[in-house]
Curated annotation (Swiss-Prot):
Protein name per Swiss-Prot or TrEMBL: Putative germin-like protein subfamily 1 member 9
Family: Belongs to the germin family.
Primary residence: secreted
Known glycosylation sites: 78
Function of the molecule: May play a role in plant defense. Probably has no oxalate oxidase activity even if the active site is conserved.
Assembly with partners or alone: Oligomer (believed to be a pentamer but probably hexamer).
Organism of derivation: Arabidopsis thaliana (Mouse-ear cress)
InterPro entries hit by this protein: Cupin_1 (IPR006045), Germin (IPR001929), Germin_Mn-BS (IPR019780), RmlC-like_jellyroll (IPR014710), RmlC_Cupin_sf (IPR011051)
Amino acid sequence: MKSFSFLAVLSILAITLSLSKASDPSSLQDFCVGVNTPADGVFVNGKFCKDPKLVTVEDFFFTGLHEARPPNPKTGSNVTAVNVNNLPGLNTLGISLVRIDYGVYGQNPPHTHPRASEVLYVAVGTLFVGFVTSNPENRLFSKTLYEGDVFVFPQGLIHFQVNVGKYPAVAFAGLSSQNPGVITIADTVFGSNPQIDPSFLASAFQVDPKIVMDLQTKFIKP
């Protein structure tokens, strides 16, 4: 019986440890304002902690999400991110926020967040959103959202949003990491540096190599 209890405790500890490693580490202090220099700091979760005596209220403050940003001509959208890089007080807190402005028929093209799940809130307009599950099913979950609607994108899965209304749209999203990361699928595959061999991509996508080379010219980084 004691042996069973000991094994049960070990199993629970193993599960707990695996879950804790699946998200940003928990903070062991009230806050850890992120700084990029080691002077008077302690390295925690990718950033140095600012000396608590030097922390000010501005370290926990960001302004600008009330402002609409002009859409990117290529995608028709613009993402304003609030993460540990521009709000250092988020360091070790495991959260971040974005505002997404969509032009008419603009889109936030297929992408993933390798380190975070996302909950999206539609503030203005109408969006068609969705995500695709992993292999082998690659099942699409999609829905048209209206003002006040909320949708969740699981961590790591490819997802997208498209403005299907006749007017600009605005959405806000919370993410479960201080620095969730973004991998935009088309940019990554066709705009890599150095470029992936077109013949390989042509075989992978089962298209003519000329099509791949044309796509690579559209996504190449300046």
